[in-house]
C-alpha cells in the first residue's frame, strides 16, 4: 500500500483531502496527516488520516483513521481493503 493508493481510495469514495502536515525524520521515514472532508465546500472535517511511510517508494508502514466527531480511532489499517472499509463506514 502506498500514499497513491490512499489518495485513490479516498477519491473513489468521493471525499476530499487536504494535507494538514508532513514531518520528515531525515532518515527516510515520513509521517503525514491528512484532513478528510466530505466535499471541497465542506469546512468541517470528517476524519484525520495519519500515514507513516518511507520516502523511497512511499510504501506505507503505518496507517490509522481517527473520526473527527468524537476523535475515536476508527481502525489501524494493514491493507488498502481495511482502509476502504473504514472510509465507507464514516
Residues covered by each model-derived region:
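Intrinsically disordered, low-complexity regulatory segments enriched in Ser/Thr/Pro
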Residues: 43-85
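Short, flexible helical or helix-coil boundary motifs
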Residues: 13, 17, 56, 87-90
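Long, highly charged amphipathic alpha-helices
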Residues: 5, 82-89
Amino acid at each position: 500500500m502506498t500514499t497513491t493508493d490512499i489518495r485513490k481510495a479516498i477519491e473513489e469514495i468521493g471525499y476530499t483531502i487536504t494535507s494538514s502536515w508532513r514531518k520528515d525524520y531525515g532518515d527516510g521515514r515520513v509521517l503525514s496527516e491528512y484532513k478528510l472532508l466530505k466535499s471541497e465546500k465542506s469546512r468541517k472535517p470528517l476524519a484525520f488520516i495519519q500515514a507513516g511511510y518511507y520516502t523511497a517508494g512511499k510504501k506505507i508502514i503505518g496507517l490509522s483513521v481517527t473520526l473527527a466527531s468524537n476523535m475515536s480511532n476508527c481502525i489501524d489499517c494493514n491493507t488498502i481493503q481495511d482502509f476502504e472499509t473504514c472510509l465507507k463506514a464514516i
